[in-house]
Structure formats: C-alpha cells, structure tokens
UniProtKB/Swiss-Prot annotation:
Residues reported to bind Mn(2+) 2: E299, N301
Annotated TM spans: none
Residues binding Mn(2+) 3, per UniProt: Q808, E820
UniProt lineage: Bacteria, Bacillati, Actinomycetota, Rubrobacteria, Rubrobacterales
Amino-acid positions noted as binding Mn(2+) 4 in the UniProt annotation, renumbered to this chain: E820, N822
Protein name: Carbamoyl phosphate synthase large chain
Organism expressing this protein natively: Rubrobacter xylanophilus (strain DSM 9941 / JCM 11954 / NBRC 16129 / PRD-1)
Protein's GO biological process: 'de novo' UMP biosynthetic process; glutamine metabolic process; L-arginine biosynthetic process
Positions bound to ATP 1: R129, R169, G175, G176, R208, V210, E215, G241, V242, H243, Q285, E299
Binding annotation for ATP 2: R694, K733, E740, G765, V766, H767, S768, Q808, E820
InterPro entries noted in UniProt: ATP-grasp, ATP_grasp_subdomain_1, CarbamoylP_synth_lsu, CarbamoylP_synth_lsu_oligo, CarbamoylP_synth_lsu_oligo_sf, CbamoylP_synth_lsu-like_ATP-bd, CbamoylP_synth_lsu_CPSase_dom, MGS-like_dom
Segments of this protein annotated with the region Carboxyphosphate synthetic domain: 1-402
Functional pathway: Amino-acid biosynthesis; L-arginine biosynthesis; carbamoyl phosphate from bicarbonate: step 1/1; Pyrimidine metabolism; UMP biosynthesis via de novo pathway; (S)-dihydroorotate from bicarbonate: step 1/3
Length: 1054
C-alpha cells in the first residue's frame, strides 16, 4: 500500500523524564520514529519534557515543544499546531495514557486528529485488565484465575475463594508501578490500596500467582494488510514473580521446544489480531509450565516497549522505525530491511548468536529498603552482550555491569539483584544442579551453563597454552577472570594472551544468520576464525559510551556521545562507538559509522582500538566509566583526544586541585583528607561542624553525607566508610546558607567558551543532580557572573582542559568559592544546550579534532526566557526510604520548563517532573528550628495567595508571634487529627517540611513518606518553597498554559 497522503502533519508524544520502568529506550524509539516520518515527507511535531533526549534536539522534528506531558498542555499544542494525526505508541505508557485522556476529553474529535498505530478501543482492551482477560477467553487462551477489583473488600472476597499467594497488577501503569505479591490478608489490603492509588483508572487485577513458572516474551508486528511477524523471542532467566525489567533475559529463547515455540507464536498472532493493533509493534508475555507444555497469557503492551528496544538491538530489526512507517500506510513487505538492504521487513529475523541482558540496580542509594525483587520493577539500567553461546554472552554481560562483585551479597533462595552470582557461589561450594533449581526455579539449562563456567575456572592452569586460552576466551572469560583463576595480574594475562596470538574476531549483526551480507556495520567480538569488520576509507575516531544507566551516570552522557558521533561524521571521520547499553540512541546501528556492542573494559576497548587503528579515542563524553580507562589506554599507546589523563587527575585529586586553587587565588571552602577514622574526627573538629564527608573518587555523591557533630560523624564512619591511604576520606567545611552554581564550558587550550551559568534553587547541601536549577541565574549580579566566568577560564587554562568541563561554585552575598571541577561532559550539558541553542558536545567535538573556538564562533541565543531543570525521583519504588534531599544523588532523570518568567518555568518543570503545584487550598508548614525565622516570609506568601496555613505547634508559635494566623495541627500520636490523618483524607494540598532529626523514625520522615504515598507535593527546603510560591503565582496568572516551541524561541532570540 502507498504511504498515506491524506495526512501531512503528525504529532508524536514522548515519554517524559527518565523513571524506573520508562527510560532511555523511548528516546531511542522516538528518535527513530521522528527521523523515519521526516524522511517520508511528513511534518513532525514533538511534545516531550525531557531535555536530555536526542529526540528533543530541534533538528529531529519540525516543531519541538519541551512542555509538561499533561492533557491540557498537549491539547494546547494541538490547538496551535492542528496536526492531522497523533502517534502515541512510541512514548511508553505516558503517551498511551495521554492519548486515551485526550480522546475521552473530546480534544481529538474537536480538532479532527486521527490516531495512528493503535485505536482507543485496542488500547483499552490491552491495558484494562478485565477487558484483556475477556478478550483472551474469547479466543480460547488461558489467563491465570483473576478478577478486576476497584475496592479492598472485592479483593478480600476473591482471596477467600482462590487463596494465596496473589499478584496485584494495576491497570494503565508502567514498570509494574503499584504491583506486588500478597502472601496474606494484611499484605493484600495494603497492596490493593497502593495499586488503586497507582492506577489512573483506579482498578487492579488480582490474580492467582504462577510464581516459579518460566516467563517468555514475544515481540510482534502487524500491518494494515494483516501480515504479522515475530521479531524476537525473549526468555527470562528468573522465573515468574520477578518483573521482566529486573530479570536477566536471553534472546532467542533457549529452553522452548519447537512445539512450545510454535504454540506461543500462534497465540501471539491471535492476540494481536484480537486486541486490534492494526499497525505497529506489541510485546506479549507468557508464563509456561516448567513441567509441561501448558501456558498462560500474562499481559500485552500495545506499543513499543522496553523489551522492543532490547529486541531491536538483539536482532538489528528497527522496530520503532518500522512501526512508524506501518502507521502511515506501508505494509511489511514494502519496507526494506536497512541491515541487509536486500530483504523486506516481512522476513522474520534469524539469529546465529545469543544475546543476554542483565539489569543494573541502585539499592545502595536507598539504604534500609528491601532488595527483594517482585513484580514491581526496581532496576535503573541494563547491559546487553552478544556471544556465539549463552556462556559467552552471559560472561560478557557480567563484565559490562561495572560493579564490585566483592560487595554483592545475594541469597540463592530469594529473588534479589545479581542472584546469578549466588548461583555461581553455590556451584563452587559443591551444590548440585537439582538443588539449585529447587531453590531458585531457574531452568536447569542455565544452571548447567553456569556449572560449565565453574568447571572451567577450576581447570585453569598456571601455565596457559594458546589452545586453553582460546577455549576459555571462547566461553567468554575476560582477562580479569583468567587472572583471578590463575593468580596472575590481569596485565600479565593480557600480555601472555597477546604473545600467544590470541585475539578476538568481530562478527556482524545481520538479522538473517549470515544468509545475506550486512550493510550496516554493527559488530560483536568472539573468538573464531573469520572476521567480518569492513573498515571505511575515512580516518576513524573511537567514542566510548557510558555503559549502563545508573543514578549519577544516565542518559545525559549518552546524549553527549551521540552528538560526538554525529559531529565526527559531519567532519569526514568514521565515528566508531563502543557501548554496552541496549536502551540508548548511541547503540542504534546508524548513529555511528561502526558500532561495537562490547563491555567498557580495558581489554575490550583495547582490542577494538587494535582492530580499528583510530586517529584517537574520545573519553570525556561518557561520564566516569571511560575516564577510568584513560591511563591504561595511554600506556597502551592509544591517543586520548582532548584533556590529558594527567590533567584529569589534577582536577579530580582533591589535594592537587586545592593547591591549584590557592596558586590561582581562587577562594574555596576549607577541607582536609583523612586515612583513618581518628584523622577524620581531628579534621572535622579543626574545620568546625557542619562538614561534608565522603570517600574519594565518587560519582553521584555516593556515600556522601553532611554531619553536624561528633555523634553524626561516628555514625557515618561506622555505617558507611573507613579510610585508607589508597582511599582517603574527604572532609569539607559545609557552606550553610550558600547557593550552589554550575558552569558548563568548552576550552580549546587557548580560549574558553562559557556555555551557561546555572543557579541551583535549593541551597548548597543538596547534590547538584538532585537540585532544581535555572538559567540564566535569577539572583546573581552581573559582576558575580563575570567573576565566575573569570575563575572558570583560569581553571580551564591552568588545568589544560581541551573539550568540555564543568565547575561548581558556592555563592553567598559577594563571596564566590570553587568547590569542584570535572574535566568532562556533565549531566547538565543537554539541558544547557537546549536552553541556549548551542550544542556543547558538538562544539567540544570540533575542538577535540583540533579546531579553534575563535574560528567556530559559537553564539548563544540571547536570553529571553528562563529554563528550569527539575529532578525526578524513584522514591515511590522504595518503601521506607525518606524522600529527603541531601548530598548523595538519588534522582533518575529530569524535566525542563521554559517560560518568559521564572515562576512559570519553575511551575512547568515541577509539573513535568510529576509534582503539580496547587493554586489554592491548605498548606502545612513544619520546619527545623534553624529555619523558623525564614519560614515566616514563606508562610506569609502562601497566606497572601489565599492559602489556609496549618503548622506544627513550634512553627505555629513563631508564625503567630509574627502576626500570621496559623492553625495548630497536633503532634503525631498525641490525640486529635494529626498531619498524617490530614494527608490521608485529602485535607492538605502542599507541605513544607525541613528536617530536624536524624534517623528514619522522626515525625518529619513519617510526614514525607505519607505525602509521597498520597501524591501531595512535599518541599523539603525553604529555597524550594520560595520558588514554589513564584510557581503558584504564575499558575494563578495563567502563565503556565502558554506553550513555546524551541524553534520559535531560538528564532526570536537570535
């Protein structure tokens, strides 16, 4: 069928900020769709609130709105742009839910907007648990015994009939949000209440648990002519009961018989037809009885999903790109497979390799919370590896995780992060395969593979022969693993391996198991004879990606890597990407000239460098992971482009950096280092409390804390870290009541371009990644900004920075102090690039290639609007965690608000981050003693806006003494309706609560947790409360209803 000519413009809704369950895979999918539709000649309009995405780059769509993903905002975009169609299947659950909301509100009908990809009835049939169950029964497929309930008593009634355990699955949610396993009546009541709160339609499915059965997923595509293809089968190593996003998964499925696979395949085709997804992709999940052939249908996602991205990377079949073309009328047989250039998309991919995905977790950021894995997703990222066998891909994936395995404490009989390591330990201890299977329900096939690895470990000899090394490498053993088995250092093993002439070859991902030659250079390493790499005629430059997403190192760094790749190609170089993250745009097969899906270890990177012989290697865009390899690459003779490893060390070594600041006459907070607990106490007393304590060389504020006295310091030293000469404890004077400032800059070694100055909204003490910030600054005078720019230039030139750098300062009054310098891309690079219109990573890439800033002449758009970045947190996923901000980073993503006023931008950013400020109602204020005086102005501001002010007894007394009436709310547990009761019954609309005690049982902790559970905005800093006041004023004035495209903003401000 020809492409549709009755539509000219298409609106795409993105997925918003990175959250657990909805991450970088939707930037990858959305970017593919935007490009595909523009190539077809359609006008593409994009709405997304996440500035760290490639899809929100102004060239990806014709019109780009960085606005909150709320129905009223998207409706305003529709009113302004009048698109002919809406494609909602590429923005995750967020976009799907918005499409339903817009349809039910009559917006799509009012403006004549057609829905592409999936109809409203098909979305509802797939997402509403009861409708889905009825649909499956209609076509004769079994689902676990279940019932959709809308109240706790209904769930209790079902439990009496079918017993425990039960699975709770809310409707229209993502990543298992609100889902759980209930083992008894009390757990059921709590779980159903949580699930009803999580579901936008307040319904949950309560179903009989099939925990222990095997879980499989099929990625299915269908076109308007009713052609259906199965793109990929995926098997979960962990059994049912663990969310698929938290399970190790393998593609293609390894333990299905042909009969079982054909049964699932037939069922999947019947399901996609029954649900009515007429064009595009869907993910369908099954539970298969490990003792037979019977199976249940678990659920279906009628859209591109997290597994779709994995399947695309595993097979080379670009699901999102093809889904976009199917949505505008093409059929599968009319679309050419980009990988081969010779086969149509109606050919199902065939794999002659095995792909393994392992999730990456961040439980260490949330101490005190249970690490037991359930149906609610907890992982923050993932790695993928490709090998010729399952063992090879598993060991490569384990090497890609970038975790300290000695810190892992996993139990065999409890689903937990990295349980695979417990399986290995059990095998090493002599436990047999049947016993491990009994304890884990992991299929014996996978346990046997682990047993072969353990047996090979034991057979490693002190003298390694070429054949033995080659065989072990074929199994997937890294040089580090061989070193651990043989007792030699990894460098020695590497030297022996090279002396024996044992090197990897590289195979292409071609979608057809070698039947047709691959045109797109997408490679993985293995130890076989034939090498399939075809180098181009252009000189090449290697870009190291950032590896798995994690808190502190997320999509922002992938954004910089993608920009580097684009710019290298624009400058006539072959861009060679090395990365292990299947979610991201950087691992799309056509982002770079050649893609190597490999772990970011010295061994794997050096082998690619050996094969490619590049002009240089770029490390500075991928965060801390690539920087750790700088010295080893330099020793191996690789040319590191940009800032030298020596300069990197100068900036990151606290003592050396402190000496440099003193030489330059740049003020800085007093600090000290300690190698023992006693030294830490001595340094803290010398500096004077409060102090900030942390280990050296950390990312994302890991194990960083503000301590206010000896007792706090003792608790920190006992629970968190102990110093040593190799890893000293850093102790800094904490700068109370200072404002933190971030600066992103590019240096060519002679000149420095200041990309932007960002003022944090929270005071110093909150990690920069967790603080909201605004550019241009709102309280810094021009003279202060000039001094900050001067300090930044002097630091860049003195350190020897070539490329990107980020400097952090604290400011109070007329005082400016430097606190940190990172000679690499920062997490604010995408945000400041979107705010100013200057793509800093592209500019830095040109500098790395030897060009000069004076010739490039970057020109930011003159300031006409404020841009606010607001963080997004996963606190709802981690029970018992205090949602209090501090020096350790815990946010997973960010949203951005743009408006001519600061208040409007801040309100938009908060709304986009999931915190909608109320325009009226009741505000509860309860602050620490040190904040009570300043809280008077805040409370008066709310009263002036018409809010009723409620307060704790102590805070109310101060407010009344200053002439401000405030109703006293009783202390928790002392009779009468306390604030917890008020929150539960919806009697408070906004909370301002600053901490006043250490530990998890203070009243403040209980208030913050209860507010989180009931989605009441809770602000934990007075600076944040002051900004919220301005945001509420902007909402009342109607300023947040206006929308602005990036293209219009840039055109108006140049």
């Amino acid at each position: 069928m020809p492409r549709r000519d009755d539509i000219r413009s298409i609106l795409i809704i993105g997925s918003g900020p990175i959250v657990i369950g909805q991450a970088a895979e939707f930037d990858y999918s959305g970017t593919q769709a935007c490009r595909a539709l523009k190539e077809e000649g359609y006008r593409v309009i994009l709405v997304n609130s996440n500035p760290a995405t490639i899809m929100t780059d102004p060239e990806m769509a014709d019109t780009t709105y960085i606005e909150p993903l709320r129905a009223e905002t998207v409706a305003e975009v529709i009113r302004r742009e009048r698109p002919d169609a809406l494609l909602p299947t590429l923005g995750g659950q967020t976009a799907l839910n918005l499409a339903v909301e817009l349809s039910e509100a009559g917006v799509l009908e009012e403006y004549g907007v057609q829905l592409l990809g999936a109809s409203i009835p098909s979305i509802q049939k797939a997402e509403d648990r009861q409708l889905f169950r009825e649909a499956m029964e209609r076509i004769g497929l079994r689902v676990p015994e279940s019932r959709t309930v809308r109240s706790v008593p209904e769930a209790e009634e079902l439990a009496e009939r079918i017993g425990f355990p039960l699975i709770i699955r809310p409707s229209f949610t993502l990543g298992g949000t609100g889902g759980s396993v209930a083992e008894d009546l009390d757990a059921l009541r709590a779980s159903v209440r949580d699930g009803l709160d999580a579901s936008p339609v307040r319904s949950v499915l309560v179903e009989r648990s099939v925990a222990g059965w095997k879980e499989f997923e099929l990625e299915v595509m269908r076109d308007l002519a009713d052609n259906v293809v199965i793109v990929c089968s995926i098997e979960n190593v962990d059994p049912m009961g663990v969310h698929t996003g938290d399970s190790i998964t393998v593609a293609p499925a390894q333990t299905l018989s042909d009969r079982q696979y054909q049964s699932l395949r037939t069922a999947a085709i019947r399901i996609i037809r029954e649900i009515g997804v007429s064009t595009g992709g869907s993910n369908i999940q099954f539970a298969v009885n490990p003792e037979g052939d019977d199976f249940y249908v678990i659920e279906m996602n009628p859209r591109v999903s997290r597994s779709s991205a994995l399947a695309s990377k595993a097979t080379g079949f670009p699901i999102a790109k093809i889904a976009a073309r199917l949505a505008v009328g093409y059929t599968l047989d009319e679309i050419t497979n980009d990988i081969t250039g010779a086969t149509p998309a109606s050919f199902e991919p065939a794999l002659d390799y095995v792909v393994t995905k392992i999730p990456r977790f961040a439980f260490e950021k949330f101490p005190g919370t249970s690490a037991r894995l359930t149906t609610r997703m907890h992982s923050v990222g993932e790695v993928m590896a490709i090998g010729r066998t399952f063992t090879e891909s598993l060991l490569k994936a384990m090497a890609s995780l970038e975790i300290e395995t000695r810190d892992i404490q996993a139990r065999l009989d409890e689903p937990s992060p990295y349980r695979i390591f417990a399986v290995f330990e059990a095998l090493r201890a002599g436990m047999d395969i049947p016993e491990i299977y009994r304890r884990t329900s992991i299929d014996p096939f996978f346990i046997a593979a682990a047993a072969r690895i353990v047996a090979a470990e034991g057979a490693v000899e002190e003298t390694l022969s070429a054949e033995q090394v080659r065989e072990l490498k074929r199994m997937g053993f890294t040089d580090e693993a061989l070193a651990a088995c043989s007792g030699y250092p990894a460098e020695v093993v590497r030297g022996v391996r090279r002396a024996l002439g044992v090197h990897p070859t590289y195979k292409a991902v071609d979608t057809c198991a070698g039947e047709f030659p691959a045109r797109t250079p997408y490679y993985y390493s293995t130890y076989e004879q034939e090498d399939e790499v075809e180098r181009g005629e252009n000189p090449s430059v290697v870009v190291l990606g950032s590896g798995p997403n994690r808190i502190g190192q997320g999509i922002e760094f992938d954004y910089a890597c993608v920009h580097a790749s684009y710019e290298l190609k624009a400058c006539g170089y072959d861009a060679v990407m090395i990365n292990s993250n299947p979610e991201t745009v950087s691992t799309d097969y056509d982002t770079s000239s050649r893609l190597y899906f490999e772990p970011l270890t010295a061994e794997h990177v050096l082998e690619v460098v050996r094969r490619e012989r590049p002009e240089g290697v770029i490390l500075q865009f991928g965060g801390q992971s690539p920087l750790k390899l700088a010295r080893e690459l330099e020793r191996a003779g690789a040319r590191v482009l940009g800032t030298s490893p020596e300069a990197i060390d100068l900036a990151e070594d606290r003592s050396r950096f402190g000496r440099l600041l003193r030489e330059l006459g740049i003020p800085h907070p007093r600090f000290g280092t300690a190698t023992t607990a006693a030294e830490a106490r001595e340094v803290a007393r010398r500096l004077g409390y409060p102090v900030v304590v942390r280990p050296s060389y950390v990312l994302g504020g890991r194990r960083m804390e503000i301590v206010y006295g000896d007792e706090d310091l003792e608790l920190y030293l006992r629970s968190s870290v102990s110093g040593s000469p190799e890893h000293p404890i850093l102790v800094d004077k904490f700068m109370e009541a200072y404002v933190e400032v971030d600066v992103d800059a590019v240096s060519d070694g002679e000149e420095v371009y200041i990309g932007g100055i960002m003022e944090h909204i929270e005071e110093a003490g909150v990690h920069s990644g967790d603080s909201s910030c605004v550019t241009p600054p709102i309280t810094l005078t021009r003279s202060l900004q000039e001094r900050i720019e001067d300090y930044t230039r002097r630091l860049a030139l003195s350190i020897g920075v070539v490329g990107l750098m980020n400097v952090q300062y604290v400011v109070r009054g007329d005082e400016v102090m430097a606190i940190e310098c990172n000679p690499r891309a920062s997490r604010t690079v995408p945000y400041i690039s979107k705010a100013t219109g200057v793509p800093l990573a592209r500019l830095a890439t040109r500098v790395l290639l030897g060009e000069k800033l004076r010739d490039l002449g970057p020109r930011p758009a003159s300031s006409g609007s404020f841009a606010v970045k607001a963080p997004v947190f996963p606190f709802d996923r981690f029970a018992e965690v205090d949602p209090l901000l501090g020096p350790e980073m815990r946010s997973t993503g960010e949203a951005m608000g743009i408006d001519p006023t600061f208040g409007g931008a801040f309100a938009k950013a908060l709304a986009a981050a999931g915190q909608r400020l109320p325009e009226s109602g009741r505000v509860y204020v309860s602050v620490a003693d040190r904040d009570k005086r300043a809280a008077v102005l805040i409370a008066r501001g709310f009263a002036d806006l018409g809010f009723e002010v409620l307060a704790s007894e102590g805070t109310a007394g101060v407010l009344r003494n200053n002439g401000l009436p405030a109703a006293v709310v009783p202390k928790i547990g002392e009779g009468g309706e306390d604030v917890l009761g008020l929150i539960e019954r919806g009697g408070v609309d906004l909370i301002v609560n600053t901490p006043w005690g250490r530990g998890s049982r203070t009243d403040g902790y209980l208030i913050r947790r209860k507010a989180l559970m009931h989605r009441v905005p809770c602000i934990t800093t007075l600076a944040g409360a002051a900004a919220a006041l301005q945001g509420i004023e902007a909402r009342i004035r109607g300023e947040t209803r206006r929308v602005h495209s990036l293209q219009d903003l840039y055109a108006a401000r140049t």
